[in-house]
Amino acid sequence: MTESNRRDISWIFALLAAYFVLQVGVRLATSHSLDLDEAEQAFRSQWLAAGYGPQPPFYNWLQYTVFQFAGVSLTALSIVKNLLLFISYLLYGLTARLVLRDKALVAIATLGLLTIPQMAFEMQRDLTHTVAVFFSASIFFYGFIRSLKQPSLASYLIAGIGIGFGLLAKYNFAILPAAALIAALSDARLRPRIFDWRLGLTAAVALVITLPHLFWLKDNLDFATARTLEKMTASGDASYLTQVAMGVSSLALAIISFAALTVAVFAIVFGKSLRPALGSGSEWTRLLERMMLVFLAGILLLIVFGGAAGIKDRWLVPMLFILPLYFCLKIEAAGVETGKALRRFIPVVAVIMIGVPAALYGSVAAARFTGHYERLNRPYAGMLEILRKQAEPAAILAGDSLLAGNLRQDIPGVPILSADYPGFNPDLTSRRPLLLVWLLPKGGSEALPPDMAEWLQANLGTSAPEASVIDVPYFYGRGDDRYRFGYAWVNQPG
């Protein structure tokens, strides 16, 4: 091993910490408006529940807790996400250090996560629940590998925490610990680590963490799973064979989308030595191979027997996030010299660390030149500021959760309901005036949406009030481009 490979790897974590601080700054500088998942967190922070709908509640619980101390703000949202991502990378690096001797490969494996588009770009853009899955998977994977190599009460406890958090992050997380269990049981040398009394602690911790949500899930199974199943099985009137073909092809495309850039980067960095390295192996590469095979087999079962027709690349995060580490284990097993590879890898990482924040900011700011607007260009705060000059609302009914969450961060002391989410329905009988706000589709009707009119009639016995329209300049708007909102008042004073 070269001298450069022996040096301490703490610089990796310092670099990542600086990167995620930069991401917080870029997010705050880009726009005050919230995207879909951010708005969902702001909206649902008005109440604490054992379950909220199609997504398990881990991220909601975490964000609710932070909001109680820090207030509802974009800053709190961005810090929570990037702190979770930093901890995930940190745990991934610690896991790599457990199984890799070459410190250069530890660095490449850890920073290699940035070569996965779903990890580096999509998680910054939105996808809060996928961030929670990655965080949970990193905890579990560290606890699992440590339990196999350096078993202790703490390692089994960490694995249990990871499983508990993961099941509260996304239901498909269950495939990961199942794959790990089957993969370890199939190796006689690792089997004693599974038939260990401390595994009972793992199961107990996971059960305690998930128990409140499991009680809720028992009574709300259809509500919790209907939307996900609808997405997975959206094959129209296709025949069974067509549905299976759609599912398998979508899985193949998802794998390519997830892994292609990482494979390309490793091919560039290691050159001709990569291909023979992929034929090498160790007990750790064989373990990871079995885990990935079991995970993919589980998804294939969902396709063949569960009717899944559309597999999304982000659904592969609980397993395929191990790819950079897997490649590095292969390379170490082949005895490839890594000093030059690390020097070639660092510029790639630098391009990603600069390019991703620039792309995130540019996708919104470029609207002033292109006229193409994202959700973050919408001027929710400007609209609310104008309407509050007409009257101070005692409560707000928004047309959807995206709008409700954006309003919530600017007027946190007022109950905000959403017409598309019946789970939060406080008594508004004595709260007047009530402000109704909705998004106006291009070329659509300016009248009060039917679902909001139905809500008023069902909950307040009130007929639809007169609707008005307000238009507000976009963030980074081109020329005089403006975004239009519909609004109405119920019992406006004066």
From Swiss-Prot:
InterPro entries membership: LipidA_mod_glycosyltrf_83 (IPR050297), RgtA/B/C-like (IPR038731)
Coiled coil start-end: none
GO CC, one annotated term: plasma membrane
Pfam families documented for this protein: PMT_2
Keywords linked to the UniProt accession: Cell inner membrane, Cell membrane, Glycosyltransferase, Lipopolysaccharide biosynthesis, Membrane, Transferase, Transmembrane, Transmembrane helix
EC nos: 2.4.1.-
Pathway annotation from the record: Bacterial outer membrane biogenesis; LPS core biosynthesis
Protein localization: Cell inner membrane
Segments crossing the lipid bilayer: 9-29, 74-94, 104-124, 127-147, 156-176, 197-217, 251-271, 291-311, 316-336, 345-365
Recorded topology in the membrane: Multi-pass membrane protein
A GO MF label: hexosyltransferase activity
Phenotype of the disrupted gene, per the record: Cells lacking this gene produce a normal lipid A structure with GalA at the 4'-position but a modified LPS core structure as this gene deletion results in addition of GalA to the 4- but not the 5-position of the outer Kdo and nearly complete addition of GalA to the Man residue. The mutant cells are also more susceptible to deoxycholic acid when compared with the parent strain, and more resistant to the polycationic antimicrobial peptide PmxB.
GO biological process: lipopolysaccharide biosynthetic process; lipopolysaccharide core region biosynthetic process
Top-level EC class as recorded in UniProt: transferase
PANTHER family tied to this protein: MANNOSYLTRANSFERASE YKCB-RELATED, MEMBRANE PROTEIN
Family: Belongs to the glycosyltransferase 83 family.
Biological function: Involved in the modification of the lipopolysaccharide (LPS) inner core. Catalyzes the transfer of a galacturonic acid (GalA) residue to the 5-position of the outer Kdo (3-deoxy-D-manno-octulosonic acid) residue of the LPS inner core, using dodecaprenyl phosphate-GalA as the donor substrate. Acts after the other GalA transferase RgtA.
The protein's name: Lipopolysaccharide core galacturonosyltransferase RgtB
The organism of origin for this protein: Rhizobium johnstonii (strain DSM 114642 / LMG 32736 / 3841)
Gene transcribed to yield this protein: rgtB
